[in-house]
């Protein structure tokens, strides 16, 4: 039986070798978003669904949502449910006078829909005046973040004549190669906003759909509305500021072995995790396992491959 067949039949819960386990999806710890700093206020809020392929060996896919806040000075694009979980956690640990603000923020988006997960780990702050992008990422099993700043990336688009209607807007097709992935997007010239999703830029209209040629990422717009929301940074989140090269190397290493130096080590001084990561075919009462950095492997599916 091929590796692909093993993964598919196991539903993603499996070990290639006895005692070596692979997580089914990243496990992000909540951030504490105390004392947020307001950078701008949105005029437009856009929500996207994202359908993600978890790895090249499996047919398993999972959904998340991305929220983009578009203001006069800044555009912020981030994983909605990862952020909301942090907001909820912050409300729980807040002082009495701060709790109502975070409770209100969490309740605004309701509960995470069934079938959706906290997969998108990035916060992309695009400064329109400085023409710079701050990339801030959560890491599996860590409360700290990593970040780097770069100029707004240059994307060289081929704009096609093909059109289609999305949410009542006539959209045009465009394609580009960017850092290891080939992207096809649909943008709406009627909404003259450069970008809107992630760090896509250089098109004369809001991104309505985007998909990678390898099928790992499919973004589809859900809603667009005129809405004021604070675009905030979170200075109390412990953050490592790195070069892009160091950022990518560290992120890859953490995803590959999330337990090593993770939250259990940081908060309990232990380099192992006790849990119930059941693999396909094991008895249901097999509920206690000890995972170490050498026996618990992660998945890595970055937006940028280069």
Where are these regions (language model features)?
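Extracellular or lumenal secretory-pathway regions
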Residues: 2-154, 160-163, 170, 216-306
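Tryptophan-centered motif/residue detector
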Residues: 156-157, 186
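Structural motif
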Residues: 166-167, 178
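Gly/Pro-enriched, hydrophobic low-complexity segments
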Residues: 172-235
